[in-house]
Amino acid sequence: MTRILGIDPGSQRTGVGIIDVDATGRVSHVHHQPLVLLGADDFPQRMKLLVLGLADLCREYEPQEVAIERVFMARNPDSALKLGQARGAAISAVVLRDLPVHEYAASEIKLAVVGRGGAEKQQVQHMVGLMLNLKTKLQADAADALAVAITHAHVRATANRLGLSARQAWGRK
C-alpha cells in the first residue's frame, strides 16, 4: 500500500487530498481538507502557514509520494506569480521530508479522472466522488487535490505493469 498526498496549490486556499493505492492500483480515500491561508496578515505569512500546514499533514498521515498540479497561465500576471510561489512553497515543504514529487498539468489530471482533458470542474468533482465512494459533495480545491493524487496512482499502476518509473511512464525525465 502506498500513500499519496495530492496538492492543488493556491495562494489563499490550497487543497490537499490523501489517498491510499494498493498494488493493483485500487484507490481509497484517507483525508482531504483545504488549507485556508487567509488568516495571515501578508503573503509571506500565508506561505509560512502553507509550509507549516503541509508539514503537519505529512507528520500525521505519512505520505510516501506527492502529486501536485502544475501552474497554468493565469490572465492576471500577479495572480500567476503568487500561484507559482505557493506551488514552490508547497514543493519545498514536502521535499524537506525527502518525498518524491510528481507534477501534472490540469489537462492531464482531467484526462486521467474524467477521460477528457477539457472537462469541467464539476465533472472532476463528480468523478472523484464516485472513484473514492464519497457520500458528500467535495469542494473544488479538495476535489482537485484528490484528482491529482488519483492521476498519480493511475500513472504509478501503469508504470508498475510496464516495469517503468512513474516519470518514464508519463514520458518525463
From Swiss-Prot:
Principal location class: cytoplasm
Record: residues binding Mg(2+) 1: D8, D141
Cofactor binding description: Binds 2 Mg(2+) ion per subunit.
Domain of life from the UniProt record: Bacteria
A GO term, aspect molecular function: DNA binding
Enzyme nomenclature, EC number: 3.1.21.10
InterPro entries found in the cross-reference section: RNaseH-like_sf (IPR012337), RNaseH_sf (IPR036397), X-over_junc_endoDNase_Mg_BS (IPR020563), X-over_junc_endoDNase_RuvC (IPR002176)
Alphabetical keyword list: Cytoplasm, DNA damage, DNA recombination, DNA repair, DNA-binding, Endonuclease, Hydrolase, Magnesium, Metal-binding, Nuclease
Positions of the catalytic residues: D8, E69, D141
Catalytic reaction equation(s): Endonucleolytic cleavage at a junction such as a reciprocal single-stranded crossover between two homologous DNA duplexes (Holliday junction)
Gene Ontology annotations for the cellular component aspect, listed alphabetically: cytoplasm; Holliday junction resolvase complex
Localization (cell): Cytoplasm
Pfam families, A to Z: RuvC (PF02075)
One biological process term in Gene Ontology: DNA repair
Subunit structure: Homodimer which binds Holliday junction (HJ) DNA. The HJ becomes 2-fold symmetrical on binding to RuvC with unstacked arms; it has a different conformation from HJ DNA in complex with RuvA. In the full resolvosome a probable DNA-RuvA(4)-RuvB(12)-RuvC(2) complex forms which resolves the HJ.
Matching HAMAP family: RuvC (MF_00034)
Function in brief: The RuvA-RuvB-RuvC complex processes Holliday junction (HJ) DNA during genetic recombination and DNA repair. Endonuclease that resolves HJ intermediates. Cleaves cruciform DNA by making single-stranded nicks across the HJ at symmetrical positions within the homologous arms, yielding a 5'-phosphate and a 3'-hydroxyl group; requires a central core of homology in the junction. The consensus cleavage sequence is 5'-(A/T)TT(C/G)-3'. Cleavage occurs on the 3'-side of the TT dinucleotide at the point of strand exchange.
Name of the protein this chain belongs to: Crossover junction endodeoxyribonuclease RuvC
Organism: Stenotrophomonas maltophilia (strain R551-3)
Lineage: Bacteria, Pseudomonadati, Pseudomonadota, Gammaproteobacteria, Lysobacterales
